[in-house]
């Protein structure tokens, strides 16, 4: 609503609009702080040899965060794994995503870590049952006119593109 029209509204209505706006801002700020705290807690799970419970906790958190960020931007949100993240964490997460989407189909005694060249320099993500290089996926989506956002996970940092940039180091 334009400011010139806002000034002509009755005082009670203007106060209600301002109150509602401030309430939404406080909710958003509270959520961002909660996400920031959760990122800090889950950063500790980006270790060389996480337990299955730790990996499950990280997976649930990143999945929920991805859904939230995707809803905020009204687009698809993927997890972008940097090279420095331990393979057991990165591929364990992708393994779990695959099992949630497809069950054990196409995964007979095969670990996701065995599917990829370990010397790869590019960031990775998991999309529709496939481990993909982010640069290739970006090119494909750009050519199709599809916008995506990423939550970037590196060895000691989880970055989510929210209205207030959240970077945990």
Curated annotation (Swiss-Prot):
Keywords on record: Host-virus interaction
Keyword ATP-binding: no
Annotated region (Binding to host SKP1 protein), positions in chain: 9-22
Domain of life: Viruses
Motif LXCXE motif, interaction with host RBR, residue range(s) on this chain: 110-114
Annotated S-S bridges: none
Functional note: Interacts with and disrupts the function of host retinoblastoma-related proteins RBR, which are key regulators of the cell cycle. Induces transcriptional activation of E2F-regulated S-phase and G2/M-phase-specific genes. Inactivation of the ability of RBR to arrest the cell cycle leads to the stimulation of viral DNA replication.
UniProt family annotation: Belongs to the nanovirus Clink protein family.
Oligomer and partners: Interacts with host SKP1. Interacts (via LXCXE domain) with host retinoblastoma-related protein 1 (RBR1). Interacts (via LXCXE domain) with retinoblastoma-related proteins (RBR).
Protein name (database record): Cell cycle link protein
